[in-house]
Amino acid sequence: MRDALDSVINSTLKEWECVIVNDGSQDETLSIAKEYEQKDNRFLVVDIPNGGLANARNVGIRNSHGKYILPLDSDDKIGEKYLEYAVNYLETHSETKLVYCLCHFFGDINGFRKLPDYSYQTILWQNVFFPACVYRRSDYDKTTGYNPNMKHGHEDWDFWLSLLSPNDKVYRIPDVQFYYRKHGVSMIDGTIKRLSETNRQLVLNHLDVYTPFLGDMIEWHNELLHYKGSYLALLKSPTYKLGHVLLSPLKWIRNIFSK
């Protein structure tokens, strides 16, 4: 948490406020937050019962007074110039709805995080943003906020679908200004069933967005079944079985020399 708060303090843009939401945490989070609040009046601590990440984001934003919003999770960091770059761009490009940047992993995994290029069609099927994008408070107020029914993750992806429309412009700063701490297991990691339920809830929250693609989805499903059937038929074919037999001696030799 200190890394996150220190990264805000070190920002080259000095006119900011940081609302720290303690979402029912019973560890040292609240004491650390109050420590920063006492030494810098740009910090504000809001202590609430545990209500989930989406609710915490909404509480933080609704207790803020700034023109722009940047949600920052407690274990991530921003670069020194991220706020400056993002705010300056939004100030001079009124047609742009959201600004983000290049991203670097740190923690259990270190390295550049390659994100797919943004298009509205792409974000319907996969999340192309990290949580800490910058957008206008006035645009947030036109939505219902982050949806608390996204209980097992994807709350940010769900919000981007509420925030963005097909013709909205998005800008990516061509510089690494966000550092995403990678843990061994994230909130969205878990069973296939839970992930499936989360994806289903995402679609249900945005039926108006996904309904026009229903015909395409049925066609894709049928194509997938066709390819699956072709693959299973290949596995049972004499040609495949013969190839497997012919390769067996080579695999045996490889295993000997690999010991």
Q: Which residue ranges define each predicted feature?
A:
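Acidic helix N-cap motif at the loop->helix transition within catalytic regions
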Residues: 1-2, 27-35, 77, 81
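Glycine-rich, basic loop-to-helix element that forms the pyrophosphate-binding segment
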Residues: 4, 48-64
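Short, acidic, metal-binding catalytic loop of nucleotide-sugar glycosyltransferases
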Residues: 6-15
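A conserved acidic beta->alpha catalytic loop
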Residues: 22-31, 50, 73
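Short aromatic/hydrophobic "clamp" motif used to bind/position activated sugar donors
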Residues: 69
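Conserved donor NDP-sugar-binding/catalytic core segment of glycosyltransferases
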Residues: 81-112
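Conserved nucleotide-sugar donor-binding catalytic segment
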Residues: 118-198
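Boundary detector for helix-to-coil junctions that initiate low-complexity/charged tails
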Residues: 197-259
